[in-house]
């Protein structure tokens, strides 16, 4: 499982011109599900995202997590995070989970996250327009297999 985590002051997702998700201070997470991801990958990624200390405390030091800050979470499924562009010019997406498995895992991720923080999402497999204001900017890449 891969994620691009961005600290944002605001983020929104539109589908067919309609806002389907919107948050204020929190994290915008693009999440890619790999074909062999398990519950262990899901749990590792969720704990990492919720507890990543990338929010500033009263001294200006990045010392607070999303949970500690009480921030919101925008989750958007993005299979292209699993693209492999090392050969040729067209990325290969063979490592991405098939849509049915990816949706099942993504939905479980959303459900578990929603039990702990306010969550908004995009629409799975829809063409989305994602806009955000990256606060910092702060952007972190995560991989449950630690491949970076």
UniProtKB/Swiss-Prot annotation:
GO BP term, example: D-amino acid catabolic process
Gene Ontology MF term list: D-tyrosyl-tRNA(Tyr) deacylase activity; Gly-tRNA(Ala) deacylase activity; Ser(Gly)-tRNA(Ala) hydrolase activity; tRNA binding
Entry EC number(s): 3.1.1.96
First and last residue of the signal peptide: none
Motif Gly-cisPro motif, important for rejection of L-amino acids, residue numbers: 136-137
Entry GO CC: cytoplasm
Catalysed reaction equations from the record: glycyl-tRNA(Ala) + H2O = tRNA(Ala) + glycine + H(+); a D-aminoacyl-tRNA + H2O = a tRNA + a D-alpha-amino acid + H(+)
Gene3D superfamilies found in the cross-reference section: D-tyrosyl-tRNA(Tyr) deacylase (3.50.80.10)
HAMAP family: Deacylase_Dtd (MF_00518)
Quaternary assembly: Homodimer.
Annotated protein name in UniProt: D-aminoacyl-tRNA deacylase
Organism, scientific name: Kosmotoga olearia (strain ATCC BAA-1733 / DSM 21960 / TBF 19.5.1)
């Amino acid at each position: 499982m891969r994620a691009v985590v961005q600290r944002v002051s605001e983020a929104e997702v539109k589908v067919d011109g309609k806002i389907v998700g919107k948050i204020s201070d929190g994290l915008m997470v693009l999440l890619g599900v790999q074909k062999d991801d398990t519950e262990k990958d899901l749990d590792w990624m969720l704990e990492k995202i919720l507890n990543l200390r990338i929010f500033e405390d009263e001294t200006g030091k990045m010392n607070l997590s999303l949970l500690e800050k009480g921030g919101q979470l925008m989750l958007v499924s993005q299979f292209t995070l699993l693209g492999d562009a090392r050969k040729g010019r067209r990325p290969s997406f063979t490592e991405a989970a098939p849509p049915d498995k990816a949706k099942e895992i993504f939905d479980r991720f959303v459900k578990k996250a929603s039990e702990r923080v306010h969550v908004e999402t995009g629409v799975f497999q829809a063409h989305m327009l994602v806009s955000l204001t990256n606060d910092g900017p702060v952007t972190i890449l995560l991989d449950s297999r630690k491949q970076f």
